[in-house]
Amino acid sequence: MLLIKELPTMKKILFSLVVLAAMMTGVRPVQACTSVIVSGHVTKDGRPLIFKNRDTSTLHNLTIVVQGSRYRYIGLVNAEDTTPINVWGGHNEAGFGIINTAAYNLNGDGGDTDGDGILIRKALELCATLEDFERLLDTMNKPREVNSNFAVLDAQGGCAYYETGNYDYVKFDVNDPNVAPEGYLMRTNFGTTGNHKLDQGVERYCAITDFMAEACKEGNLEHDYLITSISRYLKHGVTKLDMYDFMPESENDTQYFPFGDYIARYSTASVILVQGVRPDESPLNTVSWTIIGWPLTTVAIPLVLTSSGKLPAIVTDDGTGHSWLNEKGLKLKQRIFSLEAGNTTSYGDLSQLFNKQGTGILQQIQPVEGEVIARGEEAIAQLRKNSKNIKTIESYYDWVDAYLKKHYRALF
């Protein structure tokens, strides 16, 4: 067990502050997501990106394909809501993608609303462009029952945040250098146009600011890096304490650490990154890169709309009302969050996540994930060359199902 006296003086002070803050902080909003948008002007392939690390009390997530009133779409949903009423991110056949983070300061009362997931579903059903989304916002009955930073992209290269409350919204165009000088923007749980006395998620905003500055400096504003790295960034935004600096000797060297104010927390349920298309490409080449489950125990899989509506079986309802991959990830997560008394439930055992012997859960799934991503990139490249290569995607989905079941069973 990690002892405070074993730490260097400054690290000991900072560690104590993090633990004290974790113990004293009141109830945090559970809908506490972290997001990023990136202009196609700064990605190497010219395709825009929108990313969301989803926090929620509903930890059972999965993906679905739905024929909406106008467009068919891939959606990230709660496992019990596959009809669905609410969708929490995805893209449609017109190349329109959308995600959100709750912004608790936009309506002036600091409260939450019930319409954010409904609006995402309607947008996926009806919208092809940013202008369509703006018309949807303009024509909604008011109050809209929303308080979100909606991130939207389209097949024409459009990409923007919309800080949206019950009566107003403000657009932040990531393609405008006056708005986004480095070609990217970030949001957590406050709007920049809201009442800053009600801001939430400031510590995660500091963390994602640090992460993106470094990614930009290193030329890593790319889909594969962001989907595999943001939710595994374990450096505190305020104290700068990095969990990797507390690397346990082995999986038996139990070291509990408070996860409450990090990007990935106990309440993180899934991750989605929508990779748009260039204006000269088919909207059907839009990709939703998803991590269904806790992102430190599950892996990223690219999802593309097919004519059959097929997706990998392990990220859809497996007949039990849950996703196979999500459930595997939750079981592994229990090994990390093994404490059950009071506020200790937010403390994770780092030795189960990573250690100097390389036997941590995250360390074991990363090579597996690397192969899933590499094979996925190959299949998507074939689709981009010829839209008739959709069978390549479906074959890839079959391979993913078999490959991940084999390796999760062998490893764990």
Where are the predicted features?
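Short, Lys/Arg-enriched N-terminal segments with co-localized hydrophobic residues
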Residues: 1-9
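A general lysine-centric signal
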Residues: 11-12, 52
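Sec-dependent N-terminal signal peptides
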Residues: 13-22
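C-terminal segment of classical bacterial N-terminal signal peptides
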Residues: 22-30
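C-terminal, well-structured catalytic/ligand-binding subdomain of enzymes
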Residues: 34-84, 89-90, 96, 100-122, ...
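Short, charge-rich binding segments
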Residues: 89-91, 142-143
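Intrinsically disordered, low-complexity linker/loop segments enriched in Gly/Pro
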Residues: 117-148
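An amphipathic, aromatic/His-enriched active-site/gating alpha helix that lines ligand/cofactor pockets
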Residues: 151
